[in-house]
């Protein structure tokens, strides 16, 4: 046994369609804010181990980049990624499932950064939407 309730969302759909420019601007701003933050976090190296003579090259840092926002409206998305052509070892350092034991607990993974920043990223989008629709 079940109850089905249907509602007419045409007014909401019309409102969203009439506000597509504002939605696009807010989404683009939120994506730019979020990808800049995540890129910075993924490029951040932990402190070097005391007594280590290894000279860091910055190659892993330089392998990380972000692409401009893709898509349209509420389907817009951003991408932050590490290029394995630049740093072939990137997964052994920052991939949550492939990280080498020597790096566990020292280097942030994509998963730890995602979990750490989820709330702040949501706040960035909320702020951009509020800003886009202020006064309407």
Residue ranges and their predicted role:
Residues 1-21, 106:
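Disorder-to-helix initiation segments
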Residues 14-100, 123, 131, 136:
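Short, low-complexity, charged/polar segments at coil/turn and helix-coil boundaries
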Residues 94-113:
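Short helix/strand-capping connector loops at secondary-structure junctions
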